[in-house]
Amino acid sequence: MSGFNFEVMVPEQGGKVVFSLTETGSCVSFYGDDEPGEGSCELASENMDFPSCPLGNGDDFCLSLALSTMRWSGMTKRNNFMDRFIGSFVHCTPVMIWSYGNLSKKSHHKMVCHTCPDEYKFSDKDEMQGYYEECLEASTDIFLDELATVVTGGFFPVGLKGSWGGWYLKYVRYAGPLAGSSGFIVNQRFYDRAQNKTGSRVVSMVEMDGDGLSFIYEKPSVYHSDGCTGSAARFWKRDHNERAGVELRAGLHFRM
């Protein structure tokens, strides 16, 4: 893998992040109205290592997205967008082992989150909540010391930390294309560490356009899927987003 760049656009913040993924690590730069100066791209983590993953190889692709350490604050223009961005956005062969290592000072944790932590896999709610709490206990200022999962077009984890201090461990499942639309459906589940409870499920629409992908988030109250089976595509009503959309101002816009 020779490496590639993608941009994360947030127009209302007046800027964007350019994320570079290479064989030796990742590089992040932020700039607003002005183009970045020489040397403005900094290593997100000197210890970060991504497995070699052939890009554009084969007919079947998996979409892997990791957003770690999204911290929202109002300190500066840069921090008002996000003060750190670590992630990967890759198309690769159907099964990919994707792991993070040494993302913080604590490196002794070895934590693996299941790819599909649905209720039926647990004997009771306490056991399910215990699983989430155990997984989140490994989190640090950055997210998880080590997080490993298998991406097969199924669930993959995304970490978000809001300015209110709540940790959200979001599992997203690709649920198939939406007939008659350029978008596809994902299911999401939130866990709010601050409130110590499992959050609501939501259904989201991911719009694909000429520039790339736009993630559009729905209110948690809007849920029409049975989890791992991916039946959301049968129930999705596109106007839900206009009526009940809770988005990060049209979400995160990715452009390869």
From Swiss-Prot:
**Does the record carry Hydrolase as a key word?**
no
Please indicate which superkingdom the organism of origin belongs to: Viruses
The answer to whether UniProt assigns keyword Transmembrane to this entry is no
Q: Where in the cell is it found?
A: Host cytoplasm, Host perinuclear region; Host cytoplasm
> Per the UniProt record, which residue ranges are transmembrane?
none
Q: What does this protein do?
A: Plays a role in inhibition of the host innate immune system by counteracting the type I interferon signaling.
Q: What is this protein called?
A: Non-structural protein 1
Record the organism: Infectious salmon anemia virus (isolate Atlantic salmon/Norway/810/9/99)
Q: Name one GO biological process term.
A: symbiont-mediated suppression of host innate immune response
Task: Identify one Gene Ontology CC term for this UniProt entry.
Answer: host cell perinuclear region of cytoplasm
